[in-house]
């Protein structure tokens, strides 16, 4: 009986020790990276100018291809996951849900060619790549296919979310703004 209680107590404390290890890993790993990316993004906004960024966002927002294909690709390549989502703040309210849908998927689909984007989820691509390597199949076509299918899927995710947002606007009797107000 005492052994079971002791084992339970050790397990319980071990749970918090493991949580502490994860926390320390985040403090020394992802958090400094995110803070650095935030500083760089805000510095770029200051250097380029808030008005110019807003105008660029308006131009990107006017076209679904730039909104859900180009902007998520550039944002994900430059700012990685999860900072690419912050670019959505420059888009009008109407397109924010759709941008998030496209950008969140781009963090996964670009990993094959650009592993710096989302190293925490690289294991998905590497698992598939390991199977192909075992079969002696080259990985180049896989990485390119992963990217191209991802880009097309990103676009459709954004576009479909646009359509569902419009349905909910009508259903709720609201109209989301199509201009940027920061």
Swiss-Prot record:
One GO cellular component, as annotated: plasma membrane
Pfam families reported for this sequence: EII-GUT
Any single biological process term in GO: phosphoenolpyruvate-dependent sugar phosphotransferase system
Entry keyword set: Cell inner membrane, Cell membrane, Membrane, Phosphotransferase system, Sugar transport, Transmembrane, Transmembrane helix, Transport
Entry keyword annotation includes DNA repair: no
Induction: Activated by sorbitol and repressed by glucose.
Membrane topology: Multi-pass membrane protein
Residue ranges of coiled coil: none
Broad class of where this protein is predominantly found: membrane
Function: The phosphoenolpyruvate-dependent sugar phosphotransferase system (PTS), a major carbohydrate active transport system, catalyzes the phosphorylation of incoming sugar substrates concomitant with their translocation across the cell membrane. The enzyme II complex composed of SrlA, SrlB and SrlE is involved in glucitol/sorbitol transport.
Protein name: PTS system glucitol/sorbitol-specific EIIC component
Species name: Erwinia amylovora (Fire blight bacteria)
Lineage, broadest ranks: Bacteria, Pseudomonadati, Pseudomonadota, Gammaproteobacteria, Enterobacterales
Gene: srlA
């Amino acid at each position: 009986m005492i052994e079971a209680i002791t084992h339970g107590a050790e397990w319980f404390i071990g749970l918090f020790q493991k949580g502490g290890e994860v926390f320390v890993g985040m403090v020394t790993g992802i958090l400094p990276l995110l803070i650095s990316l935030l500083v760089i993004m805000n510095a770029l906004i200051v250097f380029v100018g808030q008005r110019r960024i807003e105008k660029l966002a308006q131009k990107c927002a006017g076209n679904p291809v730039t909104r859900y294909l180009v902007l998520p690709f550039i944002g994900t390549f430059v700012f990685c996951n999860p900072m690419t989502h912050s670019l959505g703040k420059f888009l009008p309210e109407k397109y924010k849900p759709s941008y998030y849908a496209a950008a969140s998927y781009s963090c996964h689909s670009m990993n094959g060619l650009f592993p710096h984007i989302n190293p925490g989820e690289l294991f998905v691509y590497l698992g598939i790549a390991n199977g192909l390597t075992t079969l002696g199949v080259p990985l180049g076509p896989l990485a390119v296919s992963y990217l191209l299918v991802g880009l097309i899927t990103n676009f459709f995710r954004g576009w479909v979310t646009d359509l569902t947002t419009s349905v909910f606007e009508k259903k709720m009797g609201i109209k989301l703004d199509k201009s940027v107000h920061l």
